[in-house]
Amino acid sequence: FPRAAHPDLDARAWAAAQHPALSGDGPLLLLPGRGTRLKGHREAIALLARLRATGMDARLWMPGTREAGRGPYVAALEAEAQSGGVADALVIAPPITEIARAYAASDLVLQLSRKPEAFGRTVIEALSVGRPVVGWAHGGVGELLAELQPPGAVPAFDEDRLFDTVKAMLAHPPPPLATMHAYTLRAMQDATLALYHDLADDRRLAIDP
């Protein structure tokens, strides 16, 4: 999918055809990730409830959460959504293979992992499709957002700032990045190999000055 300033209409129709709860004229939030509490699903559901309480017809899609062995966790999330009045605006789905299409369908991507991640692949994938990202400013996610899209970085676990940041970004989405060349697979492989060569050269100099 090309980088675009707005969700892809065909991708949005595809998402709604699979999950009617994702239909509607309001914004679609995407939180991809495994079915574990470390991924921030509860915070995303609470965010959805606050957004909808303002009158916004927001929807939340969480692909990857519904996995084998995660039944009790998913049931707890569904109960929270029900008590928060957002069960009909939430889709807790199994992993999907067409994740780029899911990014393209969304208005905004969330990265709310409670445990700092070493890299934060979701940030790169979403920005590569032109979708804005909001996430906790820690670990690799925080570093990538600070470099590539600073307005999306939120102090870790500050749910009030999360709410304000998401509202602002939905109202005024940042323009897609002109290029992501530094984060293509080839570019990152080349950078890693260059680092290995430098380390090997330093080691040779230390052994044979």
Residue ranges with predicted function:
Residues V74-P94:
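Nucleotide-activated donor-binding/catalytic signature segment of Leloir-type glycosyltransferases, i.e.
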Residues P32, R59-A75:
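Glycosyltransferase donor-sugar binding loop
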Residues E147-D160, K167-H172:
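Conserved acidic donor-binding segment of nucleotide-sugar-dependent glycosyltransferases
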Residues A171-L205:
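A charged, aromatic-enriched C-terminal amphipathic alpha-helix characteristic of glycosyltransferases
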Residues P132-G135:
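Short hydrophobic beta-strand element within catalytic cores of glycosyltransferases
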Residues A21-K39, I45-L48, W61:
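Conserved donor-binding/catalytic core segment of Leloir-type glycosyltransferases
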Residues A104-A118:
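Acidic donor-binding loop of glycosyltransferase active sites
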Residues P95-I96, A102-S106, R121:
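Short alpha-helical donor nucleotide-sugar binding micro-motif in glycosyltransferases
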